[in-house]
Regions:
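Bacterial N-terminal signal peptides that target proteins for export
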Residues: 2-19
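Bacterial N-terminal signal peptides
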Residues: 18-27
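Acidic, polar-rich low-complexity tracts and alpha-helical solenoid repeat scaffolds
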Residues: 2-7, 26-198
């Protein structure tokens, strides 16, 4: 009798777990379908949808729209603009490596495009981001003590941007960022010197 009772209880528990799993699966599939761009949208509608999402700060869904626009209409009217805006959307969505990759891709595909300077600028910005996330708010990490390869890379990328596009409207911000990075690198050198002097 106890064997049958245990079997029934374990079956009920397994069914409950299965039911919860199916419910979660159903809810997650419904929510992701709302964010995905409608496959029936024409190029202009998809572009407008992406613009609305960017303006609203919905960067993850804007990325979906821009990627769909680029993949469905690779030679369309908005393809190059979508590629440029993907750089920004990735960056704003804290997908810095994707932003760098999108920048490099845009530079390679469109070396003479009017937005190529912007791609160089964003590539430099995305190469280094300080710890402004949740972890660093609670655990004060000293950026000067960390590995600074990314800061050096960012400094080099921004320097290249300024030398190639000295008249760009992004140059003043790039120069400010380079001052910040130079100070960070100097702090790191002082930290290393202090470490070896002890």
């Amino acid at each position: 009798m106890t064997i049958l009772h245990n079997f029934i209880n374990s079956s009920k528990r397994n069914l409950s777990i299965l039911g919860i799993f199916l419910l979660l699966l159903l809810v997650s599939s419904c929510s992701s379908n709302e964010e995905m761009p409608d496959e029936r949208l024409v190029e202009k509608e998809l572009y407008d949808q992406a613009q609305t999402r960017l303006k609203n700060g919905s960067f993850s869904t804007a990325i979906l729209s821009l990627e769909a626009l680029e993949s469905r209409f690779p030679f369309g009217r908005y393809a190059e603009q979508a590629q440029a805006e993907l750089i920004y959307a990735y960056y704003m969505n804290s997908q810095f490596e994707a932003s760098q990759s999108a920048s490099e891709r845009f530079i390679n595909l469109h070396p003479r495009h009017s937005h190529t300077g912007y791609a160089f600028y964003m590539k430099g910005l995305a190469a280094f981001t300080d710890d402004s996330g949740l972890f660093s708010r609670y655990f004060q990490s000293d950026l000067a003590k960390r590995e600074v390869v990314m800061a050096q890379t960012s400094f080099g990328e921004l320097s290249e941007f300024i030398s190639r596009y000295p008249e760009s409207k992004y140059v003043p911000h790039a120069k400010q960022r380079m001052i910040y990075l130079r100070n960070l690198l100097a702090e790191h050198e002082i930290y290393v010197a202090d470490f070896y002097m002890k």
